[in-house]
């Protein structure tokens, strides 16, 4: 089963854009089709973005975070990454390394430029959905 890390932007799109590719990606994890991993740092950044950019109140933010925490394995990475200037991007890489993820799914150009980090592929949502479908098609 694919081990996946979602960047904060994927969660934001999944929760704010119904019927989007991001929601489709998240629903694969909800349905147990992939193993989703996240960290407290990623969830903290998500809460901040939902409050500041989308004016979500604390109750709505907490509901989203609780849902993610039920779907994903929340880890506390024991590694420190300082590869990129944006510290939030480094937190994504730390989570990927600590969880031995197969893929980071993101729309962030700084992460996408890397293409791969420590054995973990870095891809856009559409490519992730294609990879998932292709991987499962070959099992039939």
Language-model regions, residue ranges each:
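Residues that mark the start of a beta-strand
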Residues: 1-3
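PIN/NYN-family metal-dependent endoribonuclease catalytic core
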Residues: 6, 16, 21-51
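Acidic, PIN/NYN-like endoribonuclease modules and their adjacent C-terminal/linker elements
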Residues: 109-140
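A secondary-structure boundary/capping signal
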Residues: 6-8, 38-39, 107-108, 124-125
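Short, well-structured alpha-helical segments
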Residues: 61-69
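Active-site neighborhoods of divalent-metal-dependent phosphate/nucleic-acid chemistry enzymes
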Residues: 71-104, 109
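Short, hinge-like loop/turn segments at secondary-structure boundaries
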Residues: 53-56, 122-123
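Alpha-helix capping/helix-boundary segments
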Residues: 10-11, 42, 110-111
